[in-house]
Amino acid sequence: MNVVIWLAVLFSTFIGYIQAEKTELTYRIISPVENQVIQRDSANKAWVEINISTSLQVSKSGSLEYRLDKNRSWEKANGEWKDERFFARLRVRAGGWHTIEVRDSRTPDHRSQVVQFGVGEVFVVAGQSNSGNYGEIKQSTQTGLVSAFDFENNKWQ
């Protein structure tokens, strides 16, 4: 019976060690946020402010990479660390949704979540009954390329 208990403790410790190894380094993209739209400029591009956080001590020796859109290659992230936050700016073309993901080049399994954001036109609509879907017919996007900011809940949707 003591052997069974000892094996159970050993197995639990081993599983805990494996889980700790898998989550040793994690990143979270603070900005851009999901479904955010950034105004394009006259060159049909925008500077996108990237803000990444980590709760763990990380090497700040240039091992952070990003991938803009799934079918593109990973690139070195050039930016600045301040405490546990990384700040960078990327030049992104307008036209549709983009995704961004971050990882540690030394341990590629340690990644951030994938965030979808857009670069294009930002319009402020106020005072129109249909702008808040209060008209006779609720409005909906036909293309999926429309996002709205909910001021009450402070989020893009």
Language-model-derived ranges and their functions:
Residues 21-157:
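Cell-envelope and extracellular/periplasmic
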